[in-house]
Amino acid sequence: MAKKIQAIRGMNDCLPTQSPLWQKLENAVKSTVSAYGYNEVRMPIVEETNLFSRAVGEETDVVSKEMYTFDDRNGDSLTLRPEGTAGCVRACIQNSLINRDEQRLWYMGPMFRHERPQKGRYRQFHQCGVEVFGLNGPDVDAELIMMTARLWRELGINEHVRLELNSIGSQEDRADYRTALVAFLEQHIDVLDEDCKRRMHTNPLRVLDTKNPEVQAILGDAPRLSEYLGEESKAHFAGLCELLDAAGIEYTVNERLVRGLDYYNRTVFEWITESLGAQGTVCGGGRYDGLVEQLGGSATPAVGFAMGLERLVLMLETLELTDVRRSVDVYVVTAGEGTMMVGMKLAEQLREAIPGVRVMSHFGGGNFKKQFKRADKVGAVVALVLGENEVAENTVVLKDLVGGEQETYNQAEVAEKIAALI
């Protein structure tokens, strides 16, 4: 027997039993972003490696350790996208979307990072991202947070997530703070682990994000970034907090929140849950006002967020919020000479007459008992039964699979009866 080929570690199949919950989540996301007037954009999965090196940062874990990078036959270095913002910015610049106008965009799709697979963290994972270009006020930052809060309510998880906010200021604000932070860390060099020592010289703000409890203990005495913010950054953050207060959205200011990608400035935020253990962040984002210019476009303010769909699916499963629409409404049962053709024709008529109805025809033979068992297995609410007598009389038996009642109707009127049942 030939050896079975397995899926790549950390890259998972989404099976028919799982896809309805995914569809429920994806539909909720789409309806939410549409309610705010945002438009979908679709970018390639593969981009030039240089895009992520320039946008995300050479010294970040994503670029230095986690990307799937390869040379194509022309010798060009290409990468499976590890995140969506850089590609979205590239698409906007290349297609002149943000030269003279604001853009409010969203996208959804797979991302790739070579990490150690564990619950809630995979090598192929899916994100929904929302990006806004051309607006620099705190009002649009607040709208994005309000958008996510609306999605949590629609999914029923709003009581199981909490919002953390911070302002990391402008590049100029951070320059003086970085100097003060490095000086502080050098005084405690013996406490720092190797990862923190590396970050101290490459991106010292990321030390604030450490999970090492010994380092966390000394950071309580570290310089506070808020004390180094300029007046514009302070006013922007105060405006955001005021808008969230007015909207009734609760939040905590976390001065150690810095996010893991280099392009952020001013507002950063995360939605966190306690339902998933270690992998607690389900959504994160912030401002990246310098990224468009950094990638060759004109100076353009921008803000966005991304949410991990696998983690949201895990949350829905953990909280037992898995009620999804059944996959089949009507099952067509046929037995006897000439019944299959009539049954398939009747199924097509139902699809034409009732928008969105899902009709499954039985194939492969079998007696009525076997066919009704299959109808029950796929979750059908109604069965249409056609035997030779029904075909001869142009009728069909409609059986309510929930209540058990059944009636015989003319084939021309059965669509109206089914519409009332489902």
From Swiss-Prot:
Top-rank taxon, per record: Bacteria
Biological processes annotated in GO: histidyl-tRNA aminoacylation
Protein keywords: Aminoacyl-tRNA synthetase, ATP-binding, Cytoplasm, Ligase, Nucleotide-binding, Protein biosynthesis
InterPro entries tied to this protein: aa-tRNA-synth_II, aa-tRNA-synth_II/BPL/LPL, Anticodon-bd, Anticodon-bd_dom_sf, His-tRNA-ligase, HisRS-like_core, HisRS/HisZ, HisRS_anticodon
EC number: 6.1.1.21
Any GO CC annotation of this UniProt entry: cytoplasm
Gene3D superfamilies: Anticodon-binding domain (3.40.50.800), Bira Bifunctional Protein, Domain 2 (3.30.930.10)
Catalytic function, reaction form: tRNA(His) + L-histidine + ATP = L-histidyl-tRNA(His) + AMP + diphosphate + H(+)
Intracellular or extracellular location(s): Cytoplasm
Molecular function per GO: ATP binding; histidine-tRNA ligase activity
UniProt family annotation: Belongs to the class-II aminoacyl-tRNA synthetase family.
HAMAP family recorded: His_tRNA_synth
Oligomer and partners: Homodimer.
Record-given protein name: Histidine--tRNA ligase
Source organism of this protein record: Vibrio campbellii (strain ATCC BAA-1116)
Lineage: Bacteria, Pseudomonadati, Pseudomonadota, Gammaproteobacteria, Vibrionales
Gene behind the chain: hisS
